[in-house]
């Protein structure tokens, strides 16, 4: 979705925008929406459950014009009916144009695969919002729009961005979200303005734990469970007090059910975050998201990008750079973001790096389940580091604020990482 919290137009997203999809094909053709007099009223937040066709070409013999076909897509999906009674509202295009001053350039926040994002104010709600407008020539389209609306209309969690409403009018497709004043995690890690204070260790662990809880909700709490498939720094938005929320659910898929272990699908996602097993086989699992989360956790710890083309070839891929260093704890201090200036707890660093190493294991069966990741990161986030304490430094005795009893309460994954310290 890009940055919700920026206040001026910027070209800083050009690199991120280019890597929205892997091996993605823009499908054309004349397939129309499958319609039936009797529809299953059960809404599922996945492209599996929404049979949406690409646009029909207006020049096709007997075809339907693009504007008409887009309207038919929504009607055939009963989109408005499916979100009735949910928290999402429907808006007219005129309402959203007025909210953004007719999409003025000074309201522009950012741009992603879906389209441009604008800041606006919905007068009748007296609420500042972020409005994402579908680029009809972009890499994402009606399918992703529908999946996003269905997913967020069904979801309700403090670590998922709130969908306020949508517009499906003529050929216009827009999504209206709560406004996230601190922008994206990417803004604070990789495009930090000169003079702006970098995220401290405690805030980084807070963001990691919150993002993990959002992922846990998708995997373990939603019915049916959902595979996110697009977890990355630019999709983690930050609210007041840096409360993290996952955003951009257009690529989400319903997870495997019963005795199935995976969902076979086209490979889509972002290079650098995509699990190698999924990229090679097209077999999507919940562990695919765990890999992506491990990359994000590495970014939080190191301050490096998932893919950085300014580095030497062998160091461009963050996971490829980190794997040899995971093998020896003595390398761990070399991996820390220099912007932290040594202000981090050594034990907390070891544990966080070991968790990320487990998440980015080559073999998906070796990666932890999300509930274990949440337990471990909740523990690290609650173990506050005080840089002003006499015993606080990146030396031998890092200072944690916690009860003595916490030693017995440490989750299994944290204890395991202390023993191993590497993958």
Swiss-Prot record:
Example of a GO cellular component annotation carried by this entry: plasma membrane
Modification Phosphoserine occurs at: 234, 264
Lipidation residue positions, type S-palmitoyl cysteine: 3
Keyword Isomerase: no
Top-level EC class: transferase
Catalytic residue positions: 230 (proton acceptor)
EC number: 2.7.11.1
Disulfide bonds: none
Residue ranges with Low complexity bias: 383-398
Biased composition (Polar residues): 43-52
Keyword vocabulary terms for this entry: ATP-binding, Cell membrane, Kinase, Lipoprotein, Membrane, Myristate, Nucleotide-binding, Palmitate, Phosphoprotein, Plant defense, Serine/threonine-protein kinase, Transferase
Compositionally biased intervals (Basic and acidic residues): 12-22, 400-423
Lipid-substituted positions (N-myristoyl glycine): 2
Residues annotated as domain Protein kinase: 103-380
Residues modified to Phosphotyrosine: 177, 278
Cellular compartments annotated: Cell membrane
Bilayer topology annotation: Lipid-anchor
Reaction(s) catalysed by this chain's protein: L-seryl-[protein] + ATP = O-phospho-L-seryl-[protein] + ADP + H(+); L-threonyl-[protein] + ATP = O-phospho-L-threonyl-[protein] + ADP + H(+)
One example GO MF annotation: protein serine kinase activity
Function: May be involved in plant defense signaling.
Protein name: Probable serine/threonine-protein kinase PBL5
Species the sequence originates in: Arabidopsis thaliana (Mouse-ear cress)
